[in-house]
Amino acid sequence: MAPFLVKSRRMTTQNPQAPTVFIVDDDAAIRFAMQALMDSVNLNHEIFSSGDEFLEKMTEQRPGCLVLDIRMPGLGGLELQEELIKRGNTLPIIFITGHGDVPMAVEAMQKGAVDFIQKPFRDQELLDRIREALATDEERREAQQHHAEVAGRLDRLTNREREVFDLVVTGKPNKVIAYELGVSQRTVEIHRARVMEKMQARSLADLVKMHMTA
């Protein structure tokens, strides 16, 4: 039984921004098996024995995914998911469920969990789900970063440039925009060029995409 007396939390990376697999399970045997599996494929991971312990550690948004037992004493999996939602934490969650927990897993999916896997499961099956969840998290973070960059560029536009931007993305020609704003067509052309430069857009299509992102 000695191998199961592992620390409830194990940190395998010194970089808090490295993608990490967070594992929360009250079963020591499961934690030990998960730890061995993560080590075998060199996945950064941290292991917790309870939802409360995990929340105490996760004081900020970090990249990675969460592998979470749906049934635990104290703070259960669904309750932990609810708390993360309240905190605005978008960490992708994979729920580990028993045979009779499918309705709970469906509820978790409806609330934003990316996947669930039933016990017993094959190691490769879990690893595949984890890699998919990590890819999902990376895509979300890239989208959030892009949104923040676009918002920053928009803030640098003058009021007039923003007016021109909002009209340009509707597909209206410079002549029509000039008429609607009560300025010359040449003025619109100048503002349009400045908008393209400040927004770092190479084409009208780029501007339209940024407008949709904003």
Give the location of each predicted region.
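Non-catalytic signal-transmission and effector/linker regions of two-component phosphorelay proteins
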Residues: 1-22, 28, 35, 149, ...
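Basic, Lys/Arg-enriched C-terminal extension of HTH/homeodomain DNA-binding domains
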Residues: 8, 193-214
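Active-site beta3 strand of CheY-like receiver
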Residues: 22, 61-67
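Acidic catalytic/metal-coordinating carboxylates
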Residues: 49-50, 75-80
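Active-site residues of response regulator receiver
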Residues: 69, 97
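Receiver (REC) domain active-site loop signature in two-component systems and cognate sites
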Residues: 72
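C-terminal output helix
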Residues: 101-103, 117, 121-130, 176, ...
